[in-house]
Design a protein with these regions (language model features):
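Membrane-helix interface/capping segments
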Residues: 56-79, 102-106
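Transmembrane alpha-helical segments of multi-pass membrane proteins
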Residues: 74-94, 149-157
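Alpha-helical transmembrane segments and their membrane-interface junctions
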Residues: 93-110
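Single conserved hydrophobic/aromatic residue that forms the stacking wall/gate
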Residues: 1-11
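Alpha-helical transmembrane segments in multipass membrane proteins, preferentially the mid-helix core
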Residues: 59-61, 120-140
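Hydrophobic, aromatic-rich membrane-embedded alpha-helical segments
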Residues: 127, 150-170
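Alpha-helical transmembrane segments
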Residues: 12-23, 37-52, 112-121
Length: 179
């Protein structure tokens, strides 16, 4: 079994931390006087930026450590699949919010932009993490160099990233069958 790392814990919370921050914000926004609403929006934005920078640093550290050999190819492949699988409910939620924004015409542009930006941020973070897995798979000779490059790029494409994560797990299992 894979030991939980800071990076995988961040991924598990990533899609839902925004919902939590927004829920707390909307609970208290009506309580605040009108002149402080702008300040509270700024605080919300600062919290989101800090959290995303933290996530970005953790993702890069995780990718580098995986590429250097902290995890075996099998462990990296399983962690990659878990990370990609956990993002699926978030993608569905963002799609629904984007669709609601699209249905709202001009008034829904904010929903639509939010859904697109959060999806792009999420796929960027999970894709960067997958690069470490691609490198580890190549170093352990489980995939060819062109295959590692192709799959590394594919980890930044919606739906293809989950399929590639499954391929990584299957290839890692073929190398070391279950004991």
């Amino acid at each position: 079994p894979i030991k939980s790392s800071a990076a995988s814990d961040v991924y598990k919370r990533q899609p839902y931390i925004y919902v939590l921050i927004l829920a707390v914000f909307f609970l208290f926004v009506d309580v605040l006087p009108e002149d402080t609403t702008d300040i509270s929006l700024l605080v919300l934005l600062i919290i989101a930026v800090i959290y995303n920078l933290y996530s970005f640093v953790i993702v890069i550290v995780n990718a580098v450590q995986t590429a250097r050999g902290k995890l075996t190819a099998g462990q990296a492949a399983r962690m990659n699949l878990i990370i990609k699988g956990i993002q699926i409910p978030a993608y569905i939620m963002h799609f629904i919010l984007g669709f609601i924004g699209l249905a709202m015409s001009v008034w829904g542009i904010g929903f639509l932009l939010w859904a697109v930006l959060i999806d792009l941020l999420t796929i960027l973070l999970t894709g960067i993490s997958s690069i470490g897995c691609s490198i580890r798979m190549r170093k352990e000779r489980l995939v060819s160099l062109p295959g590692a490059i192709f799959m590394g790029i594919g980890c930044f494409i919606y739906c293809a990233d989950v399929a590639i994560a499954i391929v990584y797990v299957v290839k890692a299992r073929k190398k070391s069958p279950a004991k």
